[in-house]
Design a protein with these regions (language model features):
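Short active-site segment of divalent metal-dependent hydrolases/proteases
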Residues: 123-127
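N-terminal secretory signal peptides that target proteins for export/translocation
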Residues: 1-13
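Bacterial N-terminal signal peptides
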Residues: 17-28
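N-terminal, motif-rich segments that launch catalysis or mediate targeting to/interaction with membranes
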Residues: 30-117, 128-175
Length: 175
């Protein structure tokens, strides 16, 4: 195993920080893009820009793969329950773990795919349609286009708490 770059720094705490980053990034980007596939792809662009330079270098050739992964869960039949908490928690863990293993093996294409899929489940957890299963998503998207993004500085003890918090905030936004 190589002990430099991301691999030397990667541990569960770092993966958790990456997951938090995905979540916080969503809070800044999502209202302006209003939950179409373009939102997931824009989030991937922001993630790529903010990665450590060595990781960015390794994953950049596979940015399109990461974007494709970020929309993949929406193509899965019968996966709706996993787009909101608590289903998103197990999916996020699975895809982050798979991405970590692929990255450590040097399979950056697979890592990019996995991290893209994980980003989808994290960001959907914060989306009101996935928290309350509102029926009029078009109205939600129209309202979302009128919102101004805000950056939040939250601290979580673990990924589960972060996703639970996102789910609660999403439900509040449709109340």
């Amino acid at each position: 195993m190589v002990e430099n770059g991301l691999i030397g720094r990667i541990n569960w705490q770092n993966l958790f920080k990456i997951a938090i980053f995905f979540g916080l990034l969503f809070l800044m980007v999502a209202p302006a893009t209003a939950w179409e596939w373009t939102a997931h792809k824009k989030i991937v662009d922001e993630i790529n820009i903010n990665l450590p330079s060595d990781v960015q270098k390794n994953l950049k050739p596979y940015l399109a793969v990461m974007k494709e992964g970020s929309t993949y869960p929406d193509t899965l039949p019968n996966d709706k329950i996993n787009h909101g908490y608590p289903g998103s928690y197990s999916q996020t863990n699975t895809w982050l773990d798979n991405g970590k293993v692929a990255y450590e093996k040097g399979d950056y294409r697979e890592a990019a795919w996995c991290f893209g899929v994980a980003s989808h489940y994290i960001t959907d957890t914060y989306s009101a349609p996935h928290c309350g299963w509102i029926k009029d998503k078009e109205k939600y998207w129209q309202i979302g286009n009128q919102l101004s993004p805000k950056k939040h500085d939250f601290h979580y003890s673990n990924l589960n708490n972060m996703l639970q918090y996102g789910n609660e905030r999403g439900k509040e936004s449709i109340a």
